[in-house]
Amino acid sequence: MIFFGSELFAGGHSSTLQDVKARGKLRCVVTTGLPGFAAPDANGVWRGFDWDFCRATAAAVFGDANAVDPITSTGKTRFTKLNAGEGDVLWRNTTITFSRDVSVKLRFLGVNYYDGQGFMVNKSLGVKSAKELDGASVCIQTGTTTELNLADFFSSNNMSYEAVTIETNDEARQNYEAGRCDIYTTDASGLASTRSSLPNPNDHMVLPEIISKEPLGPAVRQGDDAWADIITWVLNTTITAEELGVNSSNVDQMKNSNNPEIRRMLGTDGSQGAELGLSNDWAYQIIKQVGNYGEIFERNIGVNTPLGISRGLNALWTKGGLMYSPPFR
């Protein structure tokens, strides 16, 4: 049987995977810089919640979480860079929508952060509600769902606004800090990140209204289902590990667990690695080098970080949240 235009090799393995392995590095499409999610630190080392999922992918493929390069992108360029082959996978605070899934020819592969759009203001404005923002100037990133949500919210509440369009989070922060806009609107997680980087974070507040659903997740190009499977199960590994109590500190002991699902996940039993075109300890490497979902969350954006975000909807389903993974079976 002959397949034309297929991105799969014989045996069902991914051509993207083969390209990544041949290159020796994963290329991960990320933001230009969003503290807590993906940004270089003072030494130029990339860190953050989304960046850790890039690292988890590299750990699964190479057994080395550091075998990854950032492909920085704005809201306008992220999909172009992915579809043009500049990046292998997108882990970049990106909302899953109908049009992006269907028209942009991407495959979204689960939700790694449940978010919603909010508004940040300087407390000196005396504003307590987003419904008090009539006539305000608003900093807003182009090429995002935020633009459309903002227009809908103001229209439905019979309010007007002046858009101050920007392309990157740094540009938004600079304009907001300089007073060129009264309000900054983006996903609530992004607001927490921006607020933490301001000189006096306590002078600013995020208003109570959340005006949209923003399920954020990874994406790959359409046409390589085997590569999509790998990214899907990288995310699922982190969630399942947290649910089963497996973390970076105890994963070595857990390889000897009597729990059949833990043994399958860690490669002690079964052949899941071979079925993905990976080594049988691929999930072990993710957990050992990067951690489970809870570790990734708390280390980068949790309540004890400058962002101070509580788990909320991103808690496990067993703890009142929405995080839920299919079983390793």
Give the ranges of each region predicted by the language model:
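Extracytoplasmic small-molecule ligand-binding "clamshell" domains
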Residues: 13-91, 269, 276-281, 286-289, ...
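Bilobed "Venus flytrap"/periplasmic-binding protein-like clamshell domains
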Residues: 25-36, 44-62, 95-96, 115-171
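Cleavable N-terminal signal peptides
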Residues: 3, 8-9
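Acidic, polar ligand-binding/catalytic clefts
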Residues: 55, 59, 63-132, 188-212, ...
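Short helix-initiation/N-cap motifs at beta->coil->alpha
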Residues: 13-14, 68-80, 125, 163-178
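Sec-exported extracytoplasmic/periplasmic mature domains
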Residues: 21-25, 58-66, 83-87, 124, ...
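Conserved C-terminal helix/tail region of periplasmic/extracytoplasmic solute-binding proteins
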Residues: 299-329
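Extended ligand-binding regions for polar small-molecule ligands
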Residues: 11, 52-55, 59-61, 123-127, ...
